[in-house]
């Protein structure tokens, strides 16, 4: 059973049945409209975000499996901030503000893909991304919050999410 793996990055819930995906699917003898609909259904919870998708196709039987990855950290943060794109000048132009708990949620979602061993370390990593794309967190600079996390000022809040962190795959 030879399989072909197709890796693509799509806009969640908004894949169109055109190039570059359609020609590849057609060559494999797949129904383009059906596959596109299934990808859109599978990624609908990530509307407006860039989502990695892997399509595993059995080239003999034409059966396929859609594996949806986790959107980029930047996409998740921008979604929480209701911002459309990162700042081109994050030091001077802020594009939005999110809650510290949103940072924790993103850290938990991204656990399978980040190297941090603890929730605290993961949160600091996500705060770094928030800083680099021009977001503030609870109206403060993410850099300030990294320092506050190091000083233990968020330990109680982080403790509330430890269970979710430990249950997350990764």
Swiss-Prot record:
GO terms for molecular function: large ribosomal subunit rRNA binding; structural constituent of ribosome. SMART domains: RL11 (SM00649). Keywords: Ribonucleoprotein, Ribosomal protein, RNA-binding, rRNA-binding. InterPro entries: Ribosomal_uL11 (IPR000911), Ribosomal_uL11_C (IPR020783), Ribosomal_uL11_C_sf (IPR036769), Ribosomal_uL11_CS (IPR020785), Ribosomal_uL11_N (IPR020784), Ribosomal_uL11_N_sf (IPR036796). Pfam families: Ribosomal_L11 (PF00298), Ribosomal_L11_N (PF03946). GO terms for cellular component: large ribosomal subunit. GO terms for biological process: translation. It comes from the Archaea. Part of the ribosomal stalk of the 50S ribosomal subunit. Interacts with L10 and the large rRNA to form the base of the stalk. L10 forms an elongated spine to which L12 dimers bind in a sequential fashion forming a multimeric L10(L12)X complex. Belongs to the universal ribosomal protein uL11 family. Forms part of the ribosomal stalk which helps the ribosome interact with GTP-bound translation factors. PANTHER family: 60S RIBOSOMAL PROTEIN L12, LARGE RIBOSOMAL SUBUNIT PROTEIN UL11M. This is Large ribosomal subunit protein uL11. The gene is rpl11.
């Amino acid at each position: 059973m030879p399989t072909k793996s197709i890796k693509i990055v799509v806009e969640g819930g908004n894949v169109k049945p055109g190039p570059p995906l359609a020609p590849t699917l057609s060559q494999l003898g797949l129904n383009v409209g059906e596959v596109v609909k299934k990808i859109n259904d599978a990624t609908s919870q990530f509307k407006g975000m860039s989502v990695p998708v892997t399509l595993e196709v059995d080239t003999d039987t034409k059966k396929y499996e859609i594996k949806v990855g986790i959107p980029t950290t930047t996409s998740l943060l921008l979604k929480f901030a209701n911002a459309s794109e990162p700042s081109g000048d994050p030091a001077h132009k802020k594009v939005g503000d999110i809650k510290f708990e949103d940072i924790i949620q993103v850290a938990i979602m991204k656990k399978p893909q980040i190297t941090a061993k603890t929730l605290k370390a993961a949160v600091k990593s996500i705060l770094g991304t928030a800083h680099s794309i021009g977001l503030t967190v609870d109206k403060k600079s993410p850099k300030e919050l990294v320092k506050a996390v190091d000083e233990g000022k968020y330990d109680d809040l982080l403790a509330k999410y430890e269970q979710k962190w430990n249950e997350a795959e990764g």
